[in-house]
Structure formats: C-alpha cells, structure tokens
Amino acid sequence: MKTWQYQYQLFCLAVSFFSRLPVPKSTPYSDERMNQAGRYFALVGTLLGLLCVLVYAFASLFFPYQVAIVLMMAFSLLLTGAFHEDGLTDMADGIGGGMTLDKRLTIMKDSRIGTYGSATLTMALIGKFVFLTTLARQPDFGLMIVVAYTLSRAVAATLIYDMPYVSDSDTSKSKPLANAQSSTELAILILTGVLAAISLGLGVGLLLILFAILFRWAFKRWLLARLGGFTGDCLGGAQQLMELGIYLVLIAVVQ
C-alpha cells in the first residue's frame, strides 16, 4: 500500500474517533492502526477548528458576535459529540468524588453526572464563552480558535507517550490508547502543535509553547498523584483545560 494512502486512512480513523464527521466506510480498522492514528489527533483539531470558524463567520453575518459564539460552541459540541467535555466531566467526578484509586476509576465509568462533574462542565462552558467573547474583536480571532483546537489536542495526546494507562483496556472505548505511543507519533504531534502555535507569530507562539510545556508537566504530575496514570477521560479533560488555558494566555497578550 502506498505510504500516502496509509497515512490518509490513519487520518480518517483519527477523524472518526474524535468527531462525528463521516469518513469512507472502506477505511480499515484495527487497534494497531487506531494507535498509530494518534499522530493525527492534533491535525483533527485543526480541521474541527476551521469548521467552527466557518460557522462563526457565517453566523456573524446575521447575529451579534456573542450569539455567533454560542452557535459556534453548539456546533462544536455537535461536531465532536461533546466527546472531550464528557471526558472532563467524568474526570472531575472521579477524581473529585473518589477517595481511593478503585473508587475514582469506578466513578469515571459511571454514565451519571455528579456534583463535581456538573460544576466543572458549567464553569468550563461559561469560561469558554467569556474568553471567546473577550477575544472576538481581535483581527486574528479565527486563527486563535484553530490554534487552540490544534495545540490543546497535541498536548493531550502526548500524555499517552510516557504515562501508563490505568483503565480497564478490555472494556474501555479508548482501548487502543492503552498501547504505548511511538516516538514517531510523538514527533508528529509536537511538530503539529508547534507549527500551530507559531502561526500567531514567533513571540506569541513561543509563549504558548512554554505554557503547553508547563501545563503538560503539571497535569501529568497531578494525574500520577491521583490515578497513577491516565484514562481516555483524562485526555478529554486535558484537552478542555488546555484549550481554556490557551485562551487565557492570548487574552493576557492582547490586553
């Protein structure tokens, strides 16, 4: 099989895993391929960010920018099936409500939402709206969204490289992530994230890269202390928190 065709199939697998966008039904699947598709998780973020920016631009033709942002956020939730928000909620419930490792993992698998999860999700959505409305008047607002979607997924996906998977891999929907990430996957993720960051300019890009390094270090230490590793929900939580952090950094820069 030609290399480009194989890479395209891996990208399609990444798209199907992280969004509800249709991909060719003929795309072959295996746990090994899904694990290799991790190299394109950040690039999927680029695609999702571009689609969200298009929705915002179109909605802005008819509505005030605040309404356009709400519509864009709603579209993003539909686009991903609230995949990452669900992970953030489950992570908050499990780590917040469980006193032992087993209890935390059990709570994270529970489909019901608890106090910690609902409070965290509410604050995340409100925060995202406030941060985006603060940035909306910037000339490169659309690029900021694409960068946030890309870099946040790059950082979250790199956690697979050097952290143990602690969930039950036989029943988890993130089972392919239980396999170790290769240096090739890691390098592609880092390169994608770095290119996205510096697209906003070298100075801002370096600041975002520094923030990404610090966030990953702190989040990894926190997960190791609480869970001893990561779960699929933790990756979703990392993406959401990192995205919010990127918006905060950008707000600090433009103020």
Swiss-Prot record:
The chain crosses the membrane at residues 43-63, 64-84, 113-133, 141-161, 195-215, 234-254. It is an enzyme of class 2 (transferase). InterPro entries: CobS. Its cofactor is Mg(2+). One of its GO terms (molecular function) is cobalamin 5'-phosphate synthase activity. The keyword Cell membrane applies. GO terms for biological process: cobalamin biosynthetic process. Its EC number is 2.7.8.26. PANTHER family: ADENOSYLCOBINAMIDE-GDP RIBAZOLETRANSFERASE. Joins adenosylcobinamide-GDP and alpha-ribazole to generate adenosylcobalamin (Ado-cobalamin). Also synthesizes adenosylcobalamin 5'-phosphate from adenosylcobinamide-GDP and alpha-ribazole 5'-phosphate. This is Adenosylcobinamide-GDP ribazoletransferase. It comes from Vibrio vulnificus (strain YJ016). The lineage of its organism: Bacteria, Pseudomonadati, Pseudomonadota, Gammaproteobacteria, Vibrionales.
